[in-house]
């Protein structure tokens, strides 16, 4: 195999074949951030304005907040609280509304995977937490999403026999059902659907969890009680009803379809038939 034609003693970075787009890598932008600050859910909050300069366009949105928090800490000010964990778009922990859009302007992307190149130099960003009765504010941009955990506890599980693992293909699953279940299982429980819905409804989240399990034979034993208990718990948590605005599907970082709400409604009606 022939080696690259690079002069001995010259750093590889001087060869254009080993270098990225210098213009893109060097680009910096300045932003005005209008961020919601609130001590807790019992105290009133307000917007505070921060000027950020020299933000690398290749940063993620959360990395930009890290830079801002480091600056605030050095100045002896309270850093901005926000939820985050894996920063890989998997866990569903992060989330904020940017200029009225949950997770920001890029479709099918979580906040932690949103890059600053999606914004323009000199732009003003209004950053708010998820706003819904079922998501009380912990602090600043951080909200309490334990309501989702309680909905899962109400029926988002299956019953299995203990002991040895079952043989492969012992429970045949039609491909159509498997595809529907896999699509629904992509839900990471971030809450963007609730934040986007004008009614603060959690129907897409609950529909995805119900559809995921009810499509599979493993979920059959609790199929009836699952949909009843999870919908009932959703109502108890104070989430609104679905009015087919479809904002949930548009905001979902995994682009989960509202067809799963239809599947849940179908199962719910079948259980309640005389």
List PLM regions with ranges.
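Intrinsic disorder/low-complexity segments
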Residues: 1-25
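Eukaryote-biased recognition of intrinsically disordered, low-complexity regulatory segments
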Residues: 28-50
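Short strand-turn-strand beta-turns centered on an Asx-Gly dipeptide
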Residues: 36, 52-53, 98-100
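Short, contiguous acidic and Ser/Thr-rich linear segments
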Residues: 48-59
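Ferredoxin-type iron-sulfur electron-transfer modules in oxidoreductases and energy-metabolism complexes
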Residues: 59-78, 126-274
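Short, structured protein-protein interaction patches enriched in aromatics and acidic/basic residues
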Residues: 81-93
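Glycine-rich phosphate/adenylate-binding loop and adjacent beta-alpha elements
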Residues: 98-122, 127
């Amino acid at each position: 195999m022939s080696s690259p034609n690079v002069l001995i003693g010259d750093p590889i970075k001087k060869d254009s074949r080993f270098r990225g787009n210098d213009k893109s890598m060097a680009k910096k932008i300045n932003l005005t951030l209008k961020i919601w600050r609130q001590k807790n859910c019992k105290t009133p909050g307000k917007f505070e304005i921060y000027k950020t300069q020299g933000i690398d366009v290749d940063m993620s949105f959360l990395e930009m907040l890290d830079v801002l928090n480091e600056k605030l800490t050095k100045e002896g000010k309270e850093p901005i609280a926000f939820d985050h964990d894996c920063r890989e778009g998997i866990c569903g922990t992060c989330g904020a509304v940017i200029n009225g859009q949950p997770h920001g302007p890029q479709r099918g992307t979580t906040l932690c995977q949103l890059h600053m190149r999606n914004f323009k130099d000199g732009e003003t960003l209004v950053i708010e937490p998820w706003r819904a009765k079922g998501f009380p504010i912990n602090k600043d941009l951080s909200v309490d999403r334990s309501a989702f955990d309680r909905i899962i506890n109400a029926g988002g599980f299956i019953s299995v026999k203990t002991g040895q693992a079952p043989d492969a293909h012992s429970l045949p699953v039609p491909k159509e059902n498997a595809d529907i279940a896999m699509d629904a299982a992509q839900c990471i429980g971030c809450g963007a659907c609730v934040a986007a819905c004008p009614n603060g409804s959690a129907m897409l989240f609950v529909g995805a969890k119900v559809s995921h399990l009810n499509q599979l034979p493993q979920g059959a034993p609790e199929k009836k009680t699952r949909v009843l208990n999870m919908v009932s718990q959703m109502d108890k948590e104070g989430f609104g009803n679905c009015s087919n605005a479809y904002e949930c599907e548009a905001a979902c970082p995994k682009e989960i379809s509202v067809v799963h709400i239809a599947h849940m409604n179908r199962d719910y009606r079948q259980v309640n038939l005389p």
